[in-house]
């Protein structure tokens, strides 16, 4: 399980860094676990160089049984989904002209029970597109509509890899709505924009990355199965968001070190955090290619012979959507009277760009990963 956690973290950090390279100032959010689960299913059905490329990008070199690992991981995460407004949709749609091997189908039933779906795309591509969109809308309680654009499916579409994730949770300690005030958010050294800034005083886990002058704060959600981790540089020291050094230095080993509970202390913290809602949409095809998955998207080079005898089987589309909302809602109020009497409170004021991670605490799996650089349009799109 530890090997799989590290592997999934590796892919999460790789994707995060690619998105940061694409734009230094965009807000974004994505769900690494949705992407890694779908890729792991496709890896299960691949052979030859296609399998080698997928294995490398998934960081599976030291993972002995990825299928069993995902089975355990999915079971752990599914147990807490009902507690939160958390939706995780991971689908690999395969055109039914591709006859999947029975052995392959049987091998996916436990580790990927809902992820594989056959659908008639070839003979009715537009109907199939609408059917997929309708299914995604229903399974995410209406959070996502028109995931696949008109004309995106045709008779040549073979495999669609699709992920959608949304989250809105209740904190263990709610932020007092009456204390939410408009404050300046520093986009960079020179520019500010107004945000609705929430306020909380409570005992929380907080750490510090000395070499990067960055604070790490854990804000737990109700029942403490999930937490948001916020990485906040103490000052904006570059010519952009202040996150450049943190983004460049991040590796999956360093991420694991920075967010390790043993590196954090329980302290009295005065928190200022902006309310925000982010929605991002990505075509992952070019990004996954840049990470090293090439053959799987090339019908002349792809080898999915572990899945099917059908030739020219390749991934036609890889679409991902994610949405997260952060507000004051919580289950209990901290003992504010006591906390305000106590001295030596640390201040964590997120009035400048920060990185955030939604983490499943038992497995330390990254459910969502994102960057907030200030108030802007409701959604972002990346190719």
From Swiss-Prot:
UniProt-listed InterPro entries: Serpin_B9/Maspin (IPR000240), Serpin_CS (IPR023795), Serpin_dom (IPR023796), Serpin_fam (IPR000215), Serpin_sf (IPR036186), Serpin_sf_1 (IPR042178), Serpin_sf_2 (IPR042185), SERPINB5_serpin_dom (IPR033836)
GO cellular component assignments: extracellular space
Sites where a glycan is attached: 106, 133, 176, 361
Main location: secreted
Entry keywords, A to Z: Glycoprotein, Secreted
GO MF term set: serine-type endopeptidase inhibitor activity
Subcellular location: Secreted, Extracellular space
Family: Belongs to the serpin family. Ov-serpin subfamily.
Annotated function: May not exhibit serine protease inhibitory activity.
Protein name: Serpin B5
């Amino acid at each position: 399980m530890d090997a799989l956690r590290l592997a999934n973290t590796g892919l999460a950090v790789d994707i995060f860094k690619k998105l940061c390279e694409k734009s230094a100032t965009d807000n974004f959010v994505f769900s690494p676990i949705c992407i890694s689960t779908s890729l792991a299913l496709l890896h299960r059905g691949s052979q030859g160089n296609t399998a080698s490329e997928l294995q490398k990008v998934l960081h599976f070199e030291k993972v002995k049984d990825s299928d069993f690992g995902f089975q355990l991981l999915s079971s752990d995460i599914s147990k807490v989904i009902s507690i939160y407004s958390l939706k995780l949709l991971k689908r690999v749609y395969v055109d039914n002209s591709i006859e999947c091997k029975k052995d392959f189908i049987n091998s996916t039933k436990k580790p990927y029970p809902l992820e594989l779906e056959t659908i008639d795309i070839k003979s009715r591509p537009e109907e199939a597109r609408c059917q997929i969109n309708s299914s995604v809308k229903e399974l995410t309680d209406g959070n996502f509509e028109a995931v696949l654009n008109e004309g995106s499916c045709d008779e040549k579409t073979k495999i669609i890899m699709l992920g959608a994730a949304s989250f809105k949770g209740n904190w263990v300690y709610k932020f007092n709505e009456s204390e939410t005030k408009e404050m300046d958010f520093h986009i960079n050294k020179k520019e500010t924009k107004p945000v609705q800034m929430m306020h909380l005083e409570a005992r929380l886990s907080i750490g510090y990355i000395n070499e990067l002058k960055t604070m790490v704060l854990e804000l737990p959600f109700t029942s403490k199965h999930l937490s948001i981790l916020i990485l906040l540089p103490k000052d904006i020291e570059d010519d952009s968001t202040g996150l450049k050094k943190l983004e460049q230095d991040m590796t999956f080993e360093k991420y694991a070190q920075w967010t390790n509970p043993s590196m954090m202390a329980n302290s009295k913290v005065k928190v200022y955090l902006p309310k925000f809602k982010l929605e991002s949409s990505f075509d992952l095809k070019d990004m996954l290619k840049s990470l090293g998955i090439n053959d799987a998207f090339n019908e002349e080079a792809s080898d999915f012979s572990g899945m099917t005898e059908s030739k020219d089987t390749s991934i036609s589309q890889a679409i991902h959507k994610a949405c997260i909302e952060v507000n004051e809602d919580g289950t209990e109020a901290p003992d504010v009277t006591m906390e305000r009497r106590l001295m030596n409170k640390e201040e964590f004021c997120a009035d400048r760009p920060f990185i955030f991670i939604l983490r499943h605490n038992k497995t330390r799996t990254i459910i969502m990963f994102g960057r907030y650089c200030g108030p802007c349009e409701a959604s972002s799109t990346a190719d």
